[in-house]
UniProtKB/Swiss-Prot annotation:
Keyword Lyase belongs to the record: no
Any single Gene Ontology cellular-component annotation: cytosol
Family: Belongs to the NusB family.
Family annotation (InterPro entries): NusB-like_sf, NusB_fam, NusB_RsmB_TIM44
Gene Ontology BP annotations: DNA-templated transcription termination; transcription antitermination
Keywords: RNA-binding, Transcription, Transcription antitermination, Transcription regulation
Function: Involved in transcription antitermination. Required for transcription of ribosomal RNA (rRNA) genes. Binds specifically to the boxA antiterminator sequence of the ribosomal RNA (rrn) operons.
Natural source organism: Halalkalibacterium halodurans (strain ATCC BAA-125 / DSM 18197 / FERM 7344 / JCM 9153 / C-125)
Protein name: Transcription antitermination protein NusB
Pfam families: NusB (PF01029)
GO molecular function annotations of the record: RNA binding
PANTHER family xref list: ANTITERMINATION NUSB DOMAIN-CONTAINING PROTEIN, N UTILIZATION SUBSTANCE PROTEIN B-RELATED
Length: 134
């Protein structure tokens, strides 16, 4: 499983955990195709995002412009959380790669408007709370 697919599956698992309040293990298992195994990268993204969820929500909450964390779509929230986890806690991936992958995921799930929304929120969050250079 490559990193792009790992991110996609991680967002799907995070979405499920948010919507139907399932365990991390069940959410990961349910998004995998038959015979597919979760990569360690995917598992790390999901577990790290869940572990730091409250902190990640605080990072971007002030940059939603007229929205609250609870009001944004579940998929957008999952993408923002995972992207910020990757930007702030995963040291071996360049920031621009993590940033662009989040925008592409948003476009894949919600179209151009979703991509612009994620781009705007991530940009403002990163300006306010600069992650260490990778």
């Amino acid at each position: 499983m490559n990193r792009r697919l790992s991110r996609l599956r991680a967002v799907q698992a995070l979405y499920q955990m948010d919507v139907i309040d399932t365990s991390m293990e069940k959410a990961i298992e349910s998004v995998l195709d038959e015979g597919e195994e979760a990569s360690s990268f995917m598992s790390d993204l999901v577990s790290g995002t869940v572990t730091h969820q409250e902190e990640l929500d605080r990072l971007y909450a002030d940059h939603l412009q007229g929205w609250t964390v609870d009001r944004i779509g579940n998929v957008d929230r999952a993408i923002l959380r995972m992207a910020l986890y990757e930007l702030y806690y995963v040291d071996d991936i360049p920031k621009n790669v993590s940033f662009n992958e989040a925008i592409e995921l948003a476009k894949a799930f919600g179209g151009e408007d979703a991509g612009r929304f994620i781009n705007g929120v991530l940009s403002k969050t990163m300006e306010a709370y600069k992650p260490k250079d990778k």
